[in-house]
Amino acid sequence: ETISFNFNQFQQND
């Protein structure tokens, strides 16, 4: 769950 959330933020940051 945390990885999914982190990944989503990382993509948005890009």
UniProtKB/Swiss-Prot annotation:
GO molecular function annotation: carbohydrate binding
Post-translational modification: Glycosylated; contains about 9% carbohydrate. Heterogeneity in carbohydrate composition may result in different isolectin forms.
Keyword entries, A-Z: Glycoprotein, Lectin
Oligomeric and partner information: Dimer of two identical or nearly identical subunits of about 32000 apparent MW.
Protein name in the entry: Basic lectin B1
